[in-house]
Amino acid sequence: MTKVGLRIDVDTLRGTREGVPRLLATLHRHGVQASFFFSVGPDNMGRHLWRLIRPRFLWKMLRSNAASLYGWDILLAGTAWPGKNIGNANAGIIRETATYHETGLHAWDHHAWQTHSGHWSIRQLEEDIARGITALEAIIGKPVTCSAAAGWRADGRVVRAKESFNLRYNSDCRGTTLFRPLLMPGQTGTPQIPVTLPTWDEVIGPAVQAQSFNTWIISRMLQDKGTPVYTIHAEVEGIVHQPLFEDLLVRARDAGITFCPLGELLPASPESLPLGQIVRGHIPGREGWLGCQQAASAS
């Protein structure tokens, strides 16, 4: 049996309002639990449209047919009008999710984090994280124990900024296996659970067709030599591609794959995890930099 961590990112108002309820119903039908990471502040995702001037981002949007994939309400959110507060508008849905699934913070403002966190100071990072955690805890009525950086925009500064929140783990980067980030010689931070597998929008196109994606990604899960972690998005697999995701759950079960919340991947003694660090890097299919796992020495 292959155990795969299932991470569900919720970036937008529509993803929370429409995608999450469908995903909850789908997961319930198949007896699967996952980790949901919510954006809880303003939905300003439409402000990413300026990035269309960048060839790699434009190609990604064309390759994934973004208008039909996400919908124009997502693509224009926060452009001609102020972005609506996601958490306030969908508190009931978020609370229901936290009743059945591991629930953590994705971002206060997904667009702001993805656009500006790379040059924020440690204090600005801490204030933004605190704002999101405070809002999410007020909604779910219990402590937030995990987080996942929006767009995988993370580096050593983000690791340090999250240390004061006493989280059980973070999932801030792409990599191969769980690790303890090295803060300084002799001091390690909160365990990291990297995403190891590509997302739908990173690979779909000429190389991998939509109808063959499930077969392709299951093969990648079975071949993963580290600790497999797969990310879906409420805006994609929870709405337009919900039937495809349901088919994936069936095929994965038949292939001997068991999905689980990311927290279940942690060992009883996190001190046994290898050391590592998060550095800025790039991966195929995703525009811009993101946090990538790198080995580190204890000395």
From Swiss-Prot:
Pathways involved: Glycolipid biosynthesis; 4-amino-4-deoxy-alpha-L-arabinose undecaprenyl phosphate biosynthesis; 4-amino-4-deoxy-alpha-L-arabinose undecaprenyl phosphate from UDP-4-deoxy-4-formamido-beta-L-arabinose and undecaprenyl phosphate: step 2/2; Bacterial outer membrane biogenesis; lipopolysaccharide biosynthesis
Stored HAMAP family: ArnD
Top-rank lineage group of the source organism: Bacteria
Reaction catalysis annotation: 4-deoxy-4-formamido-alpha-L-arabinopyranosyl di-trans,octa-cis-undecaprenyl phosphate + H2O = 4-amino-4-deoxy-alpha-L-arabinopyranosyl di-trans,octa-cis-undecaprenyl phosphate + formate
Pfam family, one: Polysacc_deac_1
Principal EC category: hydrolase
Designated gene of the protein: arnD
Function: Catalyzes the deformylation of 4-deoxy-4-formamido-L-arabinose-phosphoundecaprenol to 4-amino-4-deoxy-L-arabinose-phosphoundecaprenol. The modified arabinose is attached to lipid A and is required for resistance to polymyxin and cationic antimicrobial peptides.
Organism phylogeny: Bacteria, Pseudomonadati, Pseudomonadota, Gammaproteobacteria, Enterobacterales
Family, as annotated: Belongs to the polysaccharide deacetylase family. ArnD deformylase subfamily.
GO MF assignments: hydrolase activity, acting on carbon-nitrogen (but not peptide) bonds, in linear amides
InterPro entries, per the entry: ArnD (IPR023557), Glyco_hydro/deAcase_b/a-brl (IPR011330), NODB_dom (IPR002509), Polysacc_deacetylase_ArnD (IPR050248)
Record's keyword terms, sorted: Antibiotic resistance, Hydrolase, Lipid A biosynthesis, Lipid biosynthesis, Lipid metabolism, Lipopolysaccharide biosynthesis
One record GO biological process: lipid A biosynthetic process
Protein name: Probable 4-deoxy-4-formamido-L-arabinose-phosphoundecaprenol deformylase ArnD
Enzyme Commission number(s) from the entry: 3.5.1.n3
Ranges where the NodB homology domain occurs: 2-260
Record-level GO cellular component terms: membrane
